[in-house]
């Protein structure tokens, strides 16, 4: 699976890779040129709550990796009206 988001204008991906062995997985997170990998055997827990994806490693001294997936808020009425006016002007 691939979770996609844009952070400060650059795409960021969270990907779950399946290796040759059906029980081996690897999680990769990368942003532009930076890539972070998590072997499945080193992950204690994975949780997802609304906008936050958390990977907890087996080593309790290691920090948790938190991946935020912002949700797009619906346009306000004013913005919707401006878009409608712009669309009407373009179609004339």
UniProtKB/Swiss-Prot annotation:
The modification N6-acetyllysine is found at residue 15. A head-to-tail association, of the N-terminal and C-terminal halves results in a closed conformation (inactive form) which is incapable of actin or membrane-binding. One of its GO terms (molecular function) is actin binding. It is found in: Apical cell membrane; Cell projection; Cell projection, Microvillus membrane; Cell projection, Ruffle membrane. GO terms for cellular component: apical plasma membrane; basolateral plasma membrane; cell cortex; cytoskeleton; microvillus; microvillus membrane; ruffle membrane. Keywords: Acetylation, Cell membrane, Cell projection, Cell shape, Cytoplasm, Cytoskeleton, Membrane, Phosphoprotein, S-nitrosylation. This is Ezrin. It comes from Mesocricetus auratus.
